[in-house]
């Protein structure tokens, strides 16, 4: 009783100030960049409080707090309480319409905000205080002493909005006394005190954040606020801030490793049901509390400390600062006995006052003096809606809800609010929103809708028929309708309230009372089978894909090639989906590149295998071909082996046993042996490796190409009796020592068509080679011209040997692997012989359509081989629990060109490579995790493993013969499919597997386990071959069964798109409310982007390109309005990934994360009429005209309608996403969009450019030039001033002409001459011969297809260092400057003389000057399209360099 009296007599800020008086020097708030002691917090909050009072604030006036987590937020919170007002936290990232409605309900006195979100705040309300602005009136005011505002425990302290069942959120009003009572009781229980360092992790709109801040301060602890970047990686944030006390949801705690956070001593978990396994994980490592409480009970009211003896998560514990009662769910006037389930009621001083502006809902949720009240001082109770029971000891167990409220990541949501918003669109007739607790849709918000056009079925069938009716009622939801519904919800609700799945039903079942039968719908969702789930998933995918489809259709000629390669009917081709999602694979991608050449189209394999739609793929392809590198073949001259050939001889040694591949064909037209010889002669002439010879010199195997065609292959004509049979047509043994590598056999039978067999030694062919051979064979049989030859295999081997010398061993395999564990399979210590004649096979088949649905249904970018390997590891971990998972080698086609001019699309040879991947057993148990780990590993390996394989067998030669000859433990080879060989227009039919392998029984095998996966018809065939003598054979056969089960039970694969996995790991924890399906890709920003972002974070004006433009109609007619320009600009934004990119601070090592969004919501501001003479003036903007969300893109456009009918606009874009070329592209596209010209799709992936550029720079490590500071009395450590000055020096036409003449006469470029001039200036002013300065180098010379039309920051910040001593002649010095700067060109592969800017894009302390040369012509200042004219009025481009020299010659540079 005494404690309650104390609580009631104190306000929150009073308790905090008491701490400030007793411990003024102790830390109160600590962030990544600010620390406040209790004394400092008290003084700052008092100043701000007094300023609010001076503005006329009054008791319980509403003050909206809208800012990011920071120290200023804590100061603002305390100051509002000291002023006697009530603070109301709002999230600036919520939809504008929702915020506007909340502001209307709150009627705030003022909004306190920060610089970061002030624009959003000002768009919502007039009275705004930017609390962290410098200077600020409240900061400069002296601190006054005197009586504080008269506030007592019954005054309102804060208001938190929660989801409401009527479609409108509810504002819960909490008083000072209520929160103080709760905070003191709970803090004492958990041990909060001086020395506690509490993590502030929850969003401010959740009441847990109030607890993290105010309860901590009441008990004398320190509030630890991580930065945005630190919130991505919670474990480092906890360690960096030395957090020892945290309040988290079970979902957040699940991803933490107790060993990774040794400082954490107390952990409170609440907001969701606490899983038993999470209790076991944490209870022995920390003091673990299970916390329960609605917002209406001042954050929390029931708690229990968990231990190994108390692991049940639904047992929430005993009341803390409150009393609990269980009543009849239908009659709160009736108590129920202990152990009986009923509705949980909370009573006591901690209860909320009620709901803001809603007496009706307050009266229904809070009851006064029910008949069963006694002398326990609690006469007012809150009806929680939770079903629970209390045992005889007073412990509470939660058992569910009596209404339709759900919790998502700790956030309480009434599904009726979502349903009300959907029905308000008038686009549907009825709807139900559910959150299934189990089944394939577990914990996913699902919307089931019926439209006005649907015909109702039986509304309340008998219970046994419910499932059948629901399943029969499911149909596809129209993509456009789904988009409109989705957008309507985004306009009014938080992202956590947006359904993740949409299902359409012709009618919703009802109960006999006429209400929707939620119980049966929920039961049906939780028991949904795979077939229904797949149809629902695919309908979601199809509608989305269709919505994102471009208007560029595939031409019939292109469609024919696609259908031929993919083996599908044109009606089944999905142009809006990617090549992979249409059933393609890497080998089929090579075939598309090869056949594309024949019709004049050039593809890059990486583009074909990207996530781009087929429409975009063909629309952005180019009719251009790079000249093949000249490297003449020399017939008869021995040449080295390819890496895979060397691997073969390492394993088989000198036995050179037969190891062949073959194909059997049925000819449609008869052919004589003489005609066949002429056909094979053409093939062998076109493909020299089909006549190759192998021999050994000094224990080294070499190969050569005989010049003569005649006799270079063997051909036989056989006459068979009866029909063809397998034994008769068994391929012959080919000896490397005496036989040709190609054997041709023509079979004539008594009846039926001829059959042709082609048998080749594996040393000269691979699966891609067989595609080429058979395609050329079909042309030769029809007497058609064969395609032109590319680079020969001999030339490729010679170039590759040189290439291997340039590879860095540390970079070819950047992932950890483990050694093979072949000994696990040996039944005895002695190694057994691994021969082809001693093998057995375990097989299974899987439906190809179902497999594709696992990929397509996820909207992910997972490739088939990644799902195959990931599912293998999951199956292996289940079956072989007694050992670590093995390293698996994945075969690849090996035809990655490492430089322009390597054209081997039409070359026959053995190019195969293999690269190792390992998924640890602890990561393999879950299919999603296993596949993600596979992708992370696979995509980290450069060039699809080509560099690793090349280095391993050409450079890093293993001297130990035993290790060289040891087989690999596991090899997986996905052979793809040979659909183009089943076409009716071919002169033959394929009668066998193409490239089927055969070997002598005594031939050594290359691996212990060979997993061959192929597609035949509509089936995916898995064949696991292994020695018949191995141990654990029963488990191996069981592995096939489990592997198939893993795939079948996968349902629809992971929802999240597969992006660059490591950045995604960082991104996951930041955007709880953002579906990763809304994200296109994530990657680490480039060095130049990091430099710009770091600089602009210190000074927002840096690297913000501002262009002020005037758009007018040449006919004199006025433009209708600014909305036309706005719509055109949105089209431009949608067309470029760079403009849909946002940047999020990462850790200090990796810099910023670049996140590319699937959709864009550009910021478009419109102003009133403006005089034509002034485009630089300011205008008061009357509000956002865009669908602005939480995503702030790095650009905005401000539109003015001029009095003369023209449009004036200011375009502000961060330099992180554009360069000078990009600006020209954007303005030209803006004009195109205005006149409805189709925009050429920008298909760029900026991270690919970064990877290519980094690979080149890796050849030369960063150097450290000596400091070169201008003038010498300035220190580079000084930050650049905020005042920028510009001095323009214009050269006369005569001077410009003279410079051009000098350049022409002496063979130097204009840029080199300008670099020379600045070199001389620096040398003069620094009195030094060793000169360094930064300069901007263009990256558009990179050999990236289409880079000339891409928008992005295709530049790099380099440092040029040159010694001017010893250069008496200026021309010599100019040539040296030119040589040094030209060496930085990104397209060159030699060592780079200009060193890359170290320190993550910064050059502080080294140089303080930069030269940037732009080629600015008249066309970039004045543009015309039809009747429109676009003029540049002014341009700003401030850089964070003290001396920045920009040269803009109108001549080629």
Swiss-Prot record:
Residues 1181-1391 are annotated as: Condensation. Keywords: Isomerase, Phosphopantetheine, Phosphoprotein. Pathway: Secondary metabolite biosynthesis. One of its GO terms (molecular function) is isomerase activity. InterPro entries: AA_adenyl_dom, AMP-bd_C_sf, AMP-binding_CS, AMP-dep_synth/lig_dom, ANL_N_sf, CAT-like_dom_sf, Condensatn. Coiled coil: none annotated. Gene3D superfamilies: 3.30.300.30, Chloramphenicol acetyltransferase-like domain (3.30.559.10), N-terminal domain of ligase-like (3.40.50.12780), Nonribosomal peptide synthetase, condensation domain (3.30.559.30). It is an enzyme of class 5 (isomerase). Transmembrane segments: none annotated. The modification O-(pantetheine 4'-phosphoryl)serine is found at residue 586. Residues 37-433 are annotated as: Adenylation. It comes from the Eukaryota. NRPS-like tryptophan epimerase; part of the fragmented gene cluster that mediates the biosynthesis of fusarochromene, a tryptophan-derived metabolite closely related to a group of mycotoxins including fusarochromanone. Within the pathway, fscC catalyzes the first step via epimerization of L-tryptophan to provide the intermediate D-tryptophan. D-tryptophan is subsequently hydroxylated by the tryptophan 6-hydroxylase fscE to yield 6-hydroxytryptophan. PANTHER family: ENZYME, PUTATIVE (JCVI)-RELATED, PTHR45398. Belongs to the NRP synthetase family. This is NRPS-like tryptophan epimerase fscC.
